[in-house]
Amino acid sequence: AERDPDKLVDIIAALEPTLGGVNLEDIKAPECFTIERRLRERMKIPVFHDDQHGTAIISAAAVINGLELVGKQIGAIKLAVSGAGAAAIACLDLLVALGVKRENIFVCDSRGVIHDRREDRLDESKKRYQQKTPARTLADVMVNADVVLGCSAAGAITQDMVKVMAPRPIILALANPEPEIRPELAKAVRPDCIIATGRSDYPNQVNNV
């Protein structure tokens, strides 16, 4: 497997005459953003990163339908996010385009909330979602959240976090193979929640295309 982004771009671009489109898979952030952008600039065929855009499309559909079921408007929701990799950022970009207000989005990576006083170096994709907020943890930002999007790791969302969400919360726990919180645990403390995971053995599977 090629690990040099420049070489990977050259290899894929050289295949253009024999392809109708390119589907990128399993390329980590932030390299995936650069590779996709450069390929789109060089190639005249569609370039699609499934881990980003496939997940974003299906997740956005889940949010739209979930909000309709619980009677909430997309422009009024508070969104908490666990994870800030390629899939999470693509989901957020699409949700913003669909009407979620950027000031109502609170993103957590492995170091906590992406806030305006962070001293570590953030890549451009994360900087778009920096917030001026005293919140520092996922538990903090999940208070009164209408939707939580999990694109992180098993167990990242606890029952205590779910308890303090807004009425009729929507939980997208998309980590695979083990979700951020299992549906039975979420339902035990919030029977009013709608929860989707990336697994086919639970109801409401939300996965990439």
Language-model-derived ranges and their functions:
Residues 35-42, 135, 142-144, 152-171:
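Rossmann-fold NAD(P) dinucleotide-binding segment
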Residues 1-77:
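Glycine/serine-rich phosphate-binding loop and adjoining beta1-alpha1 elements at the start
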Residues 30-32, 55-56, 88-89, 113-116, ...:
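Flexible loop/turn segments at secondary-structure boundaries
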Residues 23-26, 47-50, 81, 107, ...:
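General beta-strand structural signal in soluble alpha/beta enzymes
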Residues 1, 26-29, 50-53, 110-112, ...:
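Short, ordered loop/turn segments at secondary-structure junctions
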Residues 57-149:
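Glycine-rich phosphate/diphosphate-binding loop of Rossmann-like nucleotide-binding domains
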Residues 155-209:
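Rossmann-fold NAD(P)-binding glycine/threonine-rich loop
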Residues 14-16, 40-41, 70-74, 98-99, ...:
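Solvent-exposed alpha-helices and their adjacent loops that cap or buttress functional pockets
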